[in-house]
Regions:
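A conserved FAD-binding loop/helix module that cradles the flavin
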Residues: 289-290
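Short beta-strand-to-turn element immediately C-terminal to the catalytic PLP-Schiff-base lysine
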Residues: 141, 166-171, 203-207, 231-234, ...
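ATP-binding N-terminal substructure of ATP-dependent carboxylate-amine bond-forming enzymes
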Residues: 2-119
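A conserved helix-loop-beta module that forms one wall/lid of the active-site cleft
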Residues: 111-167, 172
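Structural motif corresponding to alpha-helix initiation and N-cap regions
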Residues: 68-72, 94, 141-144, 172, ...
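Peripheral (often C-terminal) accessory segments that flank ATP-dependent C-N-forming ligase machineries
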Residues: 1, 11, 19, 302-385
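Phosphate-binding core of ATP-grasp and ATP-grasp-like enzymes
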Residues: 182-235, 240-274, 278-286, 298-311, ...
Length: 385
């Protein structure tokens, strides 16, 4: 493994007379970057582990370790350098994390023995179903003869994100073709088509003793990728409570420290159907960086480091978050993008990626004010990313 340092020496760090643990993060993309920055603002140190030596979080990490998350020996060596480990994504095998934690006595949050309950789409659906939480009707596809002549979605159980690993099909002929193409990639599910009027997201965080919520937001998807997030989301108090009740049930059952995001469909009769979850900070939570006095990233790092959680308080009555998605393939012109977006009643976060490509997440913008929606749409339509 290769060790890269961003400081000449490491000193003991304290916050309110409490020594803070060194937190290790597996993964070095934008989520890792924002987690790192949040913990450093609290006075903590963060070591980051990733196989890409040029990953975005390298520029902010106190120590950056180049290694592979599918290599147990390299994971063990990294675990020995930190006090606690957390995750940027859910694509790391939970058994490897369990083995590395046992060999080093290093805590991992979320606890991999608990996060294994939801680490792929099949186990996640089974877990939610067993709790009595409404989910989209589905079945596992083991052979082409299992498929039915109805519209729906074929989904890979593991590794999907931003529409990748999800395939819309209108009939059995299409389903047969897609299944034969993807069946060698892993377990495949068929999910029935569901009519809904909104897609919503709720974030919750636990430190084992306390549970905090970020209220529902609406996510607006375009071609399988989140384009906008809006608060408030225009639902009733009853719908908000439905979400809290479901999330509380899940969080209590998981019984682990960390932050989780839950994505729901809202049906025409105002019932929530749980779509999926993520055991980490989430794209829909980037709005919390400017909407609340405590972001999802700060509360997540508080939860895994043993600090008191913060009850998030609103700083604005309303906000729209825009994902800045790549519009071309090539070098990313950061100064030009910042100039084109402007700075009136908004906050822009760029992710430090050197190259853009079509639909790649390059940053986000949080916009407030009465004209937030026209400005959000203008950014999408006119700014070259």
């Amino acid at each position: 493994m290769l060790y890269l340092f961003n400081s000449e020496f490491m000193s003991e760090v304290t916050s309110n007379n409490k020594t803070l643990p060194v937190v290790g993060i597996l993964g070095a993309g934008q989520l890792s970057t924002m987690m790192t920055e949040a913990y450093q603002q609290l006075g903590g140190r963060v070591f980051v582990f990733d196989e890409n030596p040029e990953a975005p979080a390298r520029r902010v990490a106190d120590e950056f370790v180049v290694g592979k998350t599918d290599n147990l020996d390299e994971l063990v060596a990294f675990f020995k350098r930190v006090d606690v480990v957390t995750l940027e994504n859910e694509f790391i095998d939970s058994q490897l994390l369990i083995d590395a934690a046992q060999k080093t006595s290093t805590n991992v949050f979320p606890d991999p023995s608990r996060y294994s309950l939801i680490e792929d789409k099949l186990s996640e659906n089974q877990f939610f179903d067993n709790l009595g939480i409404p989910i989209t009707e589905y079945f596992e596809v083991t052979q082409a003869s299992d498929l039915i002549d109805q519209p729906g979605y074929l989904k890979l159980a593991k590794g999907g994100y931003d529409g990748i690993g999800t395939y819309k099909v209108d009939n059995k002929a299409q389903a047969d073709e897609v299944f034969n193409t993807i069946k060698s990639s892993g377990v495949v599910l068929f999910e029935h088509n569901l009519e809904f009027k909104k897609e919503l997201s709720m974030i919750a965080v636990s430190n084992g003793d306390d549970l905090k919520f970020y209220p529902l937001v609406e996510t607006v998807q375009q071609q399988g990728t989140c384009r906008y997030v809006e608060y408030p989301c225009g639902v009733s108090a009853q719908v908000e409570q439905q979400a809290r009740d479901a999330v509380t049930l899940i969080m209590n059952k998981l019984n682990t420290c960390g932050l989780f995001a839950f994505e729901f469909f809202l049906t025409q009769d105002d019932q929530l159907v749980l779509n999926e979850s993520a055991p980490r900070p989430h794209n829909s939570g980037h709005i919390t960086l400017d909407l609340y006095d405590c972001s999802q990233f700060e509360n997540h790092m508080r939860s895994v480091s043993g600090l008191t959680l913060v009850e998030p308080k609103l700083l604005h009555d309303s906000m729209v978050m825009v994902n800045l998605l790549g519009t071309r393939d090539g070098e990313f012109d950061e100064p030009k993008v910042m100039a084109d977006i402007g700075d009136k009643n908004l906050s822009t976060t760029l992710y430090g990626k050197k190259f853009s490509r079509i639909k790649r997440k390059m940053g986000h913008v949080n916009i407030w004010g009465d004209d937030r929606w026209p400005r959000a749409k203008q950014i999408v339509e006119s700014v070259e990313i």
